[in-house]
């Protein structure tokens, strides 16, 4: 069937999207495994030792992708929460709910690896730096989104309330990104920039970008897996879910 003739709106229904998500998950999971495997190899065995930080810098191959994904996932979560709020789309709200735990995990991973990197670099596990503090606020926003959603029994009212919180929290994302430019911070500037040539070795940059692709694939696979679970939970009283779980 030509792509132009496919009725894409049919996949806005949880019942229609559920099997599609199931078919996509293995492909994203395999891609995540391959990209992360190659990224780890490049980061640990191919990339040279940094002249200033020695071997300690290698945590960048986890820290930077996790930090990037913490912001990307939040923007995606807020976007789908907003779509669900404006258009009353159940699947969009479910997707926002499914993205939240993955985003929280990415944020925690960024903070944890940042602490491990900061100890040999700054001499402290934590400093109240503008970027670190705003990243911590991002973690609290994820936790607040999940907690608020879980605290309200009515799913539709929970979707609306959590969506408002997610949309308000979007203002924190540019603060995280531009904090090193707006304030005098300990945190280094952007590792990759579109306006200037990279300051790191090519193998370092390649390893970090490959790991980032792996993290992208992982986040998509994890969100789709959790979305399927959310669909089954929210639609458990429907006939089609009863047929699925009885197989």
Residue ranges and their predicted role:
Residues 2-247:
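Polytopic transmembrane helical bundles with strong interfacial aromatic enrichment
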């Amino acid at each position: 069937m030509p792509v132009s003739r496919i009725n894409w709106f049919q996949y806005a229904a949880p019942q229609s999207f559920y099997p599609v998500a199931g078919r996509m998950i293995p492909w994203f999971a395999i891609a995540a495994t391959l990209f992360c495997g190659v990224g780890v190899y490049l980061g640990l065995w191919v990339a040279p030792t940094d002249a200033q930080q020695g071997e300690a810098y290698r945590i960048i191959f986890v820290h930077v992708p996790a930090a990037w994904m913490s912001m990307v996932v939040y923007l995606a979560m807020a976007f789908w929460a907003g779509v669900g709020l404006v258009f009353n789309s159940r699947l969009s709200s479910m997707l926002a709910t499914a993205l939240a735990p993955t985003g929280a995990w990415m944020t925690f991973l960024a903070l944890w690896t940042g602490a491990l990197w900061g100890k040999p670099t700054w001499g402290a596990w934590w400093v109240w730096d503008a970027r670190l503090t705003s990243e911590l606020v991002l973690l609290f926003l994820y936790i607040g989104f999940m907690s608020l959603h879980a605290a309200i029994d009515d799913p539709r009212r929970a979707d609306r309330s959590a969506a408002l919180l997610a949309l308000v929290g979007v203002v924190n994302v540019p603060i995280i990104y531009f904090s090193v430019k707006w304030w005098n911070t300990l945190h280094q500037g952007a590792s990759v920039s579109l306006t200037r040539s990279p300051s790191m070795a090519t193998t370092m940059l390649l390893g970090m970008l490959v790991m980032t692709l792996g993290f992208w694939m992982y986040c998509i696979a994890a969100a789709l897996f959790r979305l399927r679970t959310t669909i089954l939970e929210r639609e458990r009283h429907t006939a089609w879910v009863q047929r699925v779980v009885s197989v």
